[in-house]
């Protein structure tokens, strides 16, 4: 699946935008957010087996840009990538940019959450102020870059609630009694860090593309 790259036909190029993530939860949220744009949203899966980008940035924004540029070069298409994670005050901001692999390179939600609970136990707290943070970066084939950020503030507790969402959602309380994992998809998109960043990106893309 190739994308034309001539600057003269920029509008044609922009009708196809690759969502540069292999995370199904993120992909679903991003496809829904960009549904209102008259462009073709494409998954990385359409391009076969692609290597992972080396996410060695020190911030979410740096990692998002690394991924967007990497997959733009691999696919020849404009790309949108995000990097997001959890920052827990009692843990000095951890897991931060290491949220996806907090428990190691092959970590999953279960092992990452177990690691989170052990770290809270280590500092002898049952709950802590925390935030979810998302950086979203769009990179066009001509090098044009757009960037947005979203933040959702809450409390991390050592008691899980809810079956929805993914990542640390069952432990992330948006108020005293309700976690991100207990929200409907529509409710989550309204207040989540990624939902905020995506709405800002949609606005920027409307101005840029049309």
PLM regions and their residue ranges:
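Anionic-ligand binding patches
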Residues: 15-18, 24-210
